[in-house]
Amino acid sequence: MNSSSWSAPDHSHHPALHTAADDDFHQYLDINDMGDLSDALDFDFRDFGADHHTAPHAGRHAADHLLHPSGGEHLDTPMTGTDMSMILSPVDHAMLRHGVQQQQHHQQQQHQQHQMPTITTTAPYQNAPTALIQPSTPSEAIVNTIDAQIQFLQQQKLHAQHQQLQEQQAAFFASQQNHIVPPTPQSLELTAGSSQNYYAQSTLSDQHHSGPQKQQQPQQAIDYRYTRIKDQHDMSFTPLVSPAVTPLETHFPIDTPFAVPGAYFSPLTSPALHAQNDALGIIDQRLGMMSGSSPREMELEPPAMSQASVSPGDLARKTRKNAVKARAKSGSGIKQSPISKPIRRKTATTPMLNPQALNQLVENAAPSQERQQPLTPLIPTSSSSTAGVTDSENGSISPENLNDVVLPVEMPPPPLPKPRSAKPSPFLAPQASGSAVPINLQPGRPGIASPATPASLMKLSSPSNRNPSVVGTGSHDPMDPDHIENFELPDSINFSSAPKPAPIITTLGTPALDPLQKAAAPLQTPGLPPPPSPAVAKPLALPSAALSSPQLKPDSAHSLKRTPQLAPMGRSSKKRASVTSIQMSPALRPKISPSIKPLLPGGSAGAEDAASILLATKSNYQRILEGNTVPGVSYPSELSTNLTSKRTSHKIAEQGRRNRINSALQEIATLLPKAPAKEGGDGDGDGHSSSGGGGGSGGADREDKREKDKDKAGGGIPNSKASTVEMAIEYIKQLQKEVADANKRAEEAERKLVEMKMQGGAATGSGSSVGDAGDLGTPTTEANPVVDEDLKSGGGDAMDE
């Protein structure tokens, strides 16, 4: 059907077309009540871009296929005489096709995921007659279709965006479940330093591949949040990470950036490998720093060699001090430096250690000493200093290999005698065979170079012991303070670098030269050895030089060790001398111990008075009671009254106690018998005789005491409290014994009385029966007096009790 077939009169035949079309479009926009639209609609979405430029006939064909699959009238056929016909057809066609295709796509997604109800169209819409769909007027139909299509497309766009977000989230979680790396103890031990770099690199690569940064940021946030939650959940079920964490602790100190999959973008270049590489790089840097510290000694080589060419002693001092400082700074680096350095030191010095080479060097130095006196001492000294400081291969005389020569000679502690052997340098004296001037210069100037080695600097505390022997040399005086200044720095280095054999061996070299050439010296020129060195001047060094050097060196070693001990001994002796001097002084302390005044030669009595005054005034209670207080110190007025009341109350209580004691003693003295000695002696004698004896000695002693008391008292009354108490004690004991005897006799009397009553009852019964009362009465009369006596003596008391 062409567009010309549509006529205006056709619209007049359908007056209800407008309302019917509105109802149909509302039904079409009702998404929940729509049927299956895909069965009735079939569009090609790929021609959307080209449809904007198509002819009106293509739009009419698409509209015909949309609303009239079996043929019929067209809703979008342009009216004759209208200007909107050319614009309506292509736009309507494109928008409808786009909406239908989006609807079909969402229906498939919803059938798969069952997340949203299906969007379908109603079946009656397909069977709607074309007559009812046709609008009443062309303008109203066009407006209604445009509004309906716009609303439908807006709804479809919103649903499409929502569905796209859901699909992205589902795809993201599905990919995360496949790519998440569970945390392990190794991954937990990693440092989080390099994880930020990896995370940043991964995000940049993802941005280049995925798209704009706006989409990447929410994904990163979701990724970080999700992996952190999952790591905490997984870590609660993993075994113990460390002994300090209990299985019940679910919150572990985890570095979450390493759990993000972006950190594990490659199995080979993992953060663990990169972290290890960083650590190795740091270690390499440390090794570089340590190795860089060792060449400091090598840098000292040129100035040390330049000393041989430059004569002034100031340069030697400066280089020596710099060498000592460099050693002090690079002591730790020397420890951790490669082993090749000490090996090179040994190999470099071995050809120079032969005694022949040393003799040649000495011979070469001897003529130079004769020519140039200021330069000659620096030649061997600079070489020895370079040997100790820089280990030079050409100009070093440091005889390390002479350690082998010293061992058969049985050297005691090797490191101690270095400076002494270096200062005298007797090997130059006999071979030089010159005047005494170079000999005097040699022991002085070699001492300048000897402190180059740290061990020699350590033992420079005793040059004061050697300075008196070497008087002619004027170089010792300026150098001794230098040695003293440089003494403690090598001390710490030596303790720290004790395992190093090099400084110890270099110190052994110079002592080793002495015994060998001292052995040759007395044989060739016996007169020369005494002047050059103070050690040779000793009488012990003359008989055998080879054996004399070890004897001298232990002495020097002991002297070095004892120097710190001699000082305190000297101090102690001074202290003792001061104590003895105080004792030898007039000794005021015992006489006037509290006095502060030191010496009062003529006023000893005045000093005693002052002491008594001080003792009297020292009592703070007395001052307070008298009101004499120290200026600036005020005491409350109640304190004096309290003190007085305390003292008076104490005195009263003490006096009352004494009065009670005295009154009690007086009362005891009155209760005591006037002549208790005889009665007590008789009582004791009677008691002992009655008990069977054996207490005569105790009774005699008591009688002696009582006689003495009688003599003292005169009238039997004790003259002292002690005698009164003693007499009271004896009297109490006597009374106790008498009471015990009386009780014993009373018991015996009661027992006899009971027996007599028993016998008397039996006798009366037998007498009445037999009639022999006269015969039985005679024994009773004989026995009755005994019973009466007993009753008289103790029976009465027993009955009373």
Curated annotation (Swiss-Prot):
Any one of the GO BP annotations: regulation of transcription by RNA polymerase II
Domain bHLH: 645-735
Positions of the UniProt region annotated as Disordered: 292-317, 366-607, 628-725, 756-801
Molecular-function GO terms, alphabetical: DNA-binding transcription factor activity, RNA polymerase II-specific; protein dimerization activity; RNA polymerase II transcription regulatory region sequence-specific DNA binding
Pfam families recorded: HLH
Alphabetical list of SMART domains matching this protein: HLH
UniProt KW Cell division keyword: no
Any one GO cellular component localisation term in the record: RNA polymerase II transcription regulator complex
Compositional bias of kind Basic and acidic residues: 477-486, 676-687, 700-713
Biased composition (Low complexity): 374-386, 535-554, 765-777
Region (Interaction with negative regulatory factor): 446-540
Compartment(s) of residence: Nucleus
Annotated Polar residues bias: 387-401, 459-472, 637-646
Stated role: Factor that activates the transcription of structural genes for phosphorus acquisition.
Quaternary structure, from the entry: Binds DNA as a dimer.
Protein name: Phosphorus acquisition-controlling protein
Organism the protein comes from: Neurospora crassa (strain ATCC 24698 / 74-OR23-1A / CBS 708.71 / DSM 1257 / FGSC 987)
